[in-house]
Every structure is written in C-alpha cells, then in structure tokens.
C-alpha cells in the first residue's frame, strides 16, 4: 500500500460538483492499493497515518502527529499511485490491485479510521474526483507498508 500524505490547511473532494468530503487543518492522504495488500496492511498504514509526526511543535520541529493536533483526516483512493513508471513513457497499472480488491482494502482502511478517530472524511472510490487543497509547507511524504 502506498499513501501520499500531505499536510494541509484545508482540503475537500468534489464529485460532479458536490462536496463529498472535506477537512480543515489536517492530512489529505491519497491511497494506492497493491495486489499483496489486505486488512493487516490497512491497519498498519492507519497506525502510521495517525502517529506520523508532521506537525510542528512550539519550536517548529515536526514532533506532533495528527492525534496530537486533532486535525482532520481526508482519505482518497488513487490507484495511479501503484503504477509502474520505471520504463517507457506510459504508466503501467499492472502493479495496482484489481478494482474489487482495491475497494475492499480501501473501505477497510476507512472503517478502521472511523473506529479509531473522530474526524475522518473520504472521497468516493472509483469516481472522477476533483481534489482541492491548501498544502501547508508544503509537507508531503510517500508512506509505504
């Protein structure tokens, strides 16, 4: 599983002009599911997302996690993160999980997140989404599990 984590001042996801998920300060996370991913992988990634220290402390050092600052968590599925881009001029998506598996694993991640944390929003799996964000920093990390 790959998760592109971005620290944001605010973020929202629209589908067909309708806002389907939004947060204020927090993390926007684009999630790509790979064929070997399952429930255990989702649990491991959620732990990392909630505890990864990307927010500044009183001295400006990245010492605070999402749990520490009580920010929002916006999870958005993005199968293109799992693309193989090593050769050629066109991405190959053979390294991404099939859609049914991707949806199952992503929805499990969302379920675990909502059970563990009060401020969770999502995009819509498989939809053509417009993602709007104010990238804070910018601070962006690619997490893998």
UniProtKB/Swiss-Prot annotation:
UniProt-listed InterPro entries: Daa-tRNA_deacyls_DTD (IPR003732), DTD-like_sf (IPR023509)
What keywords were assigned to this record? Cytoplasm, Hydrolase, RNA-binding, tRNA-binding
Q: Name one GO biological process term.
A: D-amino acid catabolic process
Recorded hits in Pfam families, A to Z, give:
Tyr_Deacylase (PF02580)
CDD domains, per this entry? Dtyr_deacylase (cd00563)
Tell me where it resides: Cytoplasm
Q: Name one GO cellular component term.
A: cytoplasm
Q: Where is this motif: Gly-cisPro motif, important for rejection of L-amino acids?
A: 137-138
- Which GO molecular function annotations are given, in alphabetical order? D-tyrosyl-tRNA(Tyr) deacylase activity; Gly-tRNA(Ala) deacylase activity; Ser(Gly)-tRNA(Ala) hydrolase activity; tRNA binding
What are its E.C. numbers?
A: 3.1.1.96
Q: How does it assemble?
A: Homodimer.
Recorded hits in HAMAP family, A to Z, give: Deacylase_Dtd (MF_00518)
Of which family is this protein a member? Belongs to the DTD family.
**Stated name of the protein:** D-aminoacyl-tRNA deacylase
């Amino acid at each position: 599983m790959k998760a592109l984590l971005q620290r944001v001042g605010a973020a929202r996801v629209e589908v067909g002009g309708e806002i389907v998920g939004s947060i204020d300060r927090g993390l926007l996370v684009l999630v790509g599911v790979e064929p070997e991913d399952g429930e255990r992988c989702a649990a491991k990634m959620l732990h990392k997302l909630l505890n990864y220290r990307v927010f500044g402390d009183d001295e400006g050092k990245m010492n605070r996690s999402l749990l520490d600052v009580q920010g929002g968590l916006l999870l958005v599925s993005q199968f293109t993160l799992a693309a193989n881009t090593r050769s050629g001029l066109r991405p190959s998506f053979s390294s991404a999980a099939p859609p049914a598996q991707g949806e199952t694993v992503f929805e499990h991640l969302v379920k675990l997140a909502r059970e563990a944390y009060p401020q969770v929003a999502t995009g819509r799996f498989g939809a053509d989404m417009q993602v709007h964000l104010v990238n804070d920093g910018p601070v962006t990390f690619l997490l893998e599990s």
